[in-house]
Swiss-Prot record:
GO terms for cellular component: nucleus. The lineage of its organism: Eukaryota, Metazoa, Ecdysozoa, Arthropoda, Hexapoda. Residues 44-101, 199-259, 272-296, 599-682 are annotated as: Disordered. Its main location: nucleus. This is Transcription factor castor. A zinc finger (C2H2-type) spans 377-402, 439-463, 498-522, 556-580. One of its GO terms (biological process) is central nervous system development. Keywords: Developmental protein, Differentiation, DNA-binding, Metal-binding, Neurogenesis, Nucleus, Phosphoprotein, Repeat, Repressor, Transcription, Transcription regulation, Zinc, Zinc-finger. Residues 233-242 have a biased composition (Acidic residues). The modification Phosphothreonine is found at residue 211. Expressed in a specific subset of neuroblasts in the ventral nerve cord and the procephalic region in the embryo. Expressed in many, if not all, late delaminating NBs, and in early NBs, but only after they have undergone several rounds of ganglion mother cell-producing divisions. Residues 54-68, 81-98, 210-221, 245-254, 608-629 have a biased composition (Low complexity).
Amino acid sequence: MSNQMEFIMQLYMMNLMKQQQQMQLQLPQQQQQQQLAGYTYTQNEDISSSTSVQQQQQQQQEQLQQPQPDLRKTRTHKRISSQNTNCSSSRSCSPNSNLIAFQPQQYPGATAATPSTPNSHPSNLVNQMLLQSLPPLTQLMLQQQQQQHLLTTSNLLLTPTHTPSSLGKQDPLQHPLLLGQFAGSEQMATNNFLQSSTVTSTPIEREKAATPAPSAGATAGNLSAAQVKFEQESADDDEDDDKPLSSLTSCSSSGHTNASSEKLLLSGVHPLESTTDSLDSPSMYTPVKQPADSSYGLITPVDSDLTPNTPLQPTQTISLLTPPSSEQSKSLVSLSAASGLDALLQNEEVLKNLRKVSSYLECENSLCRQENLREHFHCHEEPCQGKILSKKDDIIRHLKWHKKRKESLKLGFARFSSSDDCAPAYGEGCAYNWKQTHYHCVYEHCPKVYVSTSDVQMHANFHRKDSEIVNEGFRRFRAHETCRIEDCPFFGKKISHYHCCREGCTHTFKNKADMDKHKTYHLKDHQLKMDGFKKILKTEVCPFDACKFSTVCNHIHCVREGCDYILHSSSQMISHKRKHDRQDGEQAYQQFKIKQDVEESSLDAMPQQQQQQQQQQPTSLSQSQSSSSVCGGSNTSTPLSSLSAEHFLARKRGRPPKKIQLPADAQQSEAKRLKVEDESSNPAMLLPQSQPAAAVHPLTSGLFPGLLPAAAAPGVDPTAPNFQLTHLMALFQLQNPLFYQNLYPGMTQNSSMLGNLAALSAASAAAAAAAAANGAGVQQPKAEFSFKPEFKE
């Protein structure tokens, strides 16, 4: 038994020596960080090597003196006992129960970051090993199995802790089972950061619970939020609940990130990381209040990045992000105003009313000559009328005065400063004249004067609403205003009401909702007037004389001329309007017929006047026509309009004429001739007697007897043959064979007959022309034969 106890004590002392070496390595770094940050650890957290050894030895003696409980405990009993131990603390139920610092220790190669939860009776395993005589190897194996058993039990009770935020902080023990056996439950309750009875542990709670002092796994380049967070615990446990919400949420950030975030905060930009840091985090920095002459946002940034050993200023550790002060906002306004003045001086629209004068010698103003002004300006903008400006400050002040005056005029107010006289425009009774800046309302019948710009805005809104009401066709009178209309039912009653401003309407109402209703009534009334009707309400007196429905019921009058019809429903208007439309159409048609008859009678009188004028013409024209016909020969011709084949093609389709008689001699006028064309079918042949023939020169007709038509002499026989028409027919047959081919399908089988017919027609036309040229002395035989072509169907 003594050998077993010595073996256990040796293992325990070896672990203590390693722990003390680690603590000695970490103490200088802890002291340096505590001096830099100005914080101290509590005595509960600062565990030195000597005190820990003494406390653990006392606990070991107490465990040996305690009676032995039941050695056989199931897994469920161990879980229940561990939960009862964890929830025994009064601080485990609070939301800030994880604020007690836990001392992590280096454990190379460890895989779990959650230490094992100790049992309420850690001496059970020691007593079992002392009472039972087992070889050392068996005892060591049993010890390892129970260690694994406790680790699996704690893993079942807790959520997984391998999260990205906890990968850089591995704080298990080398032999948590041995430390749990010889360490008291109270001491482990202080060092354990999972004291809550619940089984929902989150990485954020672990980060809140851990402190940076004993952490040896953190690298020099990275500082987690838990490493830069120093908690000052008080004696009262309830003070933890009074902390703001920002202290309950923390996130990991590196030292470089903290420095960059401080730079961003100093320049007025809020990074995303600093919004979730705790109060004590160095990344949560508030800009220091600057004096009045400095501008907000122009603070010089930090020169160097923060490192884990960089001292933190008190203003950086204990400060909140606050908006700029009133003095800073004033400096902002001054800077913006300065930039605005430069833009004001560069604006040509503002400077167009300023006239620069280089010297008083060029200026016509007597005041400038009296003062011997050199370079100065004159403002000719209304209402300055040539005000003298000699200094740059005066020019800037005057331009700003004009700008403010224009802005106030947009709101309906005239601005007057303390150096302006408002008496010429608004009388002598102003109490603010020559005293302070004030605003006069420019609207008619409005004597309001204000000093505050907020009152100006409110009064401008009143006039804006009033102008909207006027645009709708109404006028509003408030309770203190008099409408000056004695017939108004609200006259002298001090009631806000409305009047309709439309012509002939005296409607009044006090509810603004009735405005749209009355406006709709006027729109409908206008439409009825366009259709020729007028609607009278029951509440109105009918303007029509002797109307029996006046003030009795709603009715509609027809306002058309000569109509006294009264309608009682809007459905009757359609039929009544159609009746008037029909009557108007009949009247318009009658007027059109009368006008048309007058025009026809005037056209009939015109031909009679033309005939009388033609009869009075001299006979010289007829003599010239007879002489030209003698020179041209005895043949007669038709006008050019008759030479076309239009009338020839206009005849009825069928078989060609059976007989085509060739033209005979001009002297044998008594010979029979086949009438090729009816005179009634050719309107061009029927020339009116009153129409004079075209005068043709006798030489022209003699040179070209066959081409130019000769005027028909009154002494020529009308039965003489027309050679030009016959020649044209033959020529058309030669030029258009397809026409006859389509007209007479049988001709395709005897195409030579068409050529013979064309040749014969051409020969006869040439013979007739030669006979006409030889004169009347040469007699030609009477060629009277018939040509009858045969067609095979």
